[in-house]
C-alpha cells in the first residue's frame, strides 16, 4: 500500500458525508414516492462510491470500508435523531458500541 496521504483521508471523509446525505434523501423520498429525493439519493450513493474508490488508492480497502460503514452508520443514526426524532433503545446503543469497537479492531489489525 502506498504511503498514507491526507488526500485519501479527505476522500474517505467525503464518502462518509455523501453516504449520510444519501440515507437522508432516501428517508425523504418516502419509499421513492417522492422521486426527486429518490434520484438525489441514488446520485449521492454513486458519488459516495466514487469518493471511496479514490480513498482506497491510499488506504487499505478493509480499513477504508470499515471506517466508511461504521462512521456512516453512526452519523446516519445522529441524523435520524436530529432530523426525524428517531431514538435507539438499549440494545441499539449496545450494537453501536460493538460496531465502533469492531472498527477500532480492524484499524489496529
From Swiss-Prot:
Transmembrane segments: 6-26, 36-56, 64-84, 88-108
Periplasmic side: 1-5, 57-63, 109
Induction remark: Induced by spermidine.
Keyword entries, A-Z: Cell inner membrane, Cell membrane, Membrane, Transmembrane, Transmembrane helix, Transport
Superkingdom per UniProt: Bacteria
Membrane association type: Multi-pass membrane protein
Localization: Cell inner membrane
Pfam families: Multi_Drug_Res
GO biological process: choline transport; glycine betaine transport; spermidine transmembrane transport; xenobiotic detoxification by transmembrane export across the plasma membrane
Result of altering residue 5 to Q: Decrease in spermidine excretion
InterPro entries: Small_drug/metabolite_transptr, Small_multidrug_res, Spermidine_export_MdtI
UniProt keyword Metal-binding, yes or no: no
Residue ranges that the UniProt entry lists as topological domain Cytoplasmic: 27-35, 85-87
Molecular functions (GO terms): amino-acid betaine transmembrane transporter activity; antiporter activity; choline transmembrane transporter activity; spermidine transmembrane transporter activity
GO cellular component: plasma membrane; transmembrane transporter complex
Result for mutant: residue 81 to L: Decrease in spermidine excretion
Gene3D superfamilies for this protein: 1.10.3730.20
HAMAP family on file: MdtI
Function: Catalyzes the excretion of spermidine. Can also confer resistance to deoxycholate and SDS.
Oligomeric and partner information: Forms a complex with MdtJ.
Family listed: Belongs to the drug/metabolite transporter (DMT) superfamily. Small multidrug resistance (SMR) (TC 2.A.7.1) family. MdtI subfamily.
Protein name: Spermidine export protein MdtI
Amino acid at each position: 500500500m502506498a504511503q498514507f496521504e491526507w488526500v485519501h483521508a479527505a476522500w474517505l471523509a467525503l464518502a462518509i458525508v455523501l453516504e449520510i446525505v444519501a440515507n437522508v434523501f432516501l428517508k425523504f423520498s418516502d419509499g421513492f414516492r417522492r422521486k426527486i429525493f429518490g434520484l438525489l439519493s441514488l446520485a449521492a450513493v454513486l458519488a459516495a462510491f466514487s469518493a471511496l474508490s479514490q480513498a482506497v488508492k491510499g488506504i487499505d480497502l478493509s480499513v477504508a470500508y470499515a471506517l466508511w460503514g461504521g462512521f456512516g452508520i453512526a452519523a446516519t443514526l445522529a441524523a435520524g435523531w436530529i432530523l426525524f426524532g428517531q431514538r435507539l433503545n438499549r440494545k441499539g446503543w449496545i450494537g453501536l458500541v460493538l460496531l465502533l469497537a469492531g472498527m477500532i479492531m480492524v484499524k489496529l489489525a
